[in-house]
Amino acid sequence: AVASSSPKPVITETLETLDLMKYFDVVTSGDEVKNPKPAPDTFLSAAKQLGVPVDECIVIEDSTNGGKAAKAAKIPCIWMHNPDSGDQEIPDAVLEITAWTKENIEKIMKFLHFDQEKV
């Protein structure tokens, strides 16, 4: 799922432009929930729509409010440092990455216990 604070049309357009929409069953926007980030509602809504308990979810976040929302939802957070977001307070993260490199993707896969040979 994608659970973003951005308006739904922006999320959808971005995913379609990057040809990524086909990889996500659920796209949830902060404007679709009563309390957007840093409240947990966006993540809880995405998990509910997926039919997945929050203890089986993981969040990859690049904003302080998103990290706070993940913590409030009791979902582990992988922190993706975004140099374009200014000085962000890094939330309690189970893993930190600084770029979408092969090495960092492998770190995430290892953390999630994915067998990369089967992916």
Where are these regions (language model features)?
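Hydrophobic beta-strand core positions in alpha/beta domains
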Residues: A1-V2, W79
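Conserved phosphate-coupling serine/threonine residues in phosphotransfer and NTP-handling enzymes
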Residues: S4-S6
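Asp-based, Mg2+/Mn2+-dependent phosphohydrolase catalytic module
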Residues: K8, T12-V119
